Amino acid sequence: MSLLPVMVIFGLSFPPVFFELLVPLALFFLLRRLLQPTGIYDFVWHPALFNTALYCCLFYLISCLFV
């Protein structure tokens, strides 16, 4: 249960989890952009699965901070 209120922007109601999804998405794009030049994706068996797991881990960490 989040303590953040429901946000209303231009008459559209957004639940708190919407913003909890946007913050890790921004961090994911930044982290992915930093990891690509390091060559870590050469050691990853399935890059799409790695990206999904990375986003899920970031979402979990951010949602723990918001609670």
From Swiss-Prot:
Membrane topology qualifier: Multi-pass membrane protein
KW Ribosomal protein (keyword) present: no
Signal sequence region: none
Compartments it resides in: Cell membrane
A GO cellular component annotation in the UniProt record: plasma membrane
Primary localization: membrane
One Pfam family hit: DUF1656
Keywords: Cell membrane, Membrane, Transmembrane, Transmembrane helix
Repeat among keywords: no
Sequence intervals crossing the membrane: 9-29, 47-67
Highest taxon, organism lineage: Bacteria
Family: Belongs to the AaeX family.
Protein name: Protein AaeX
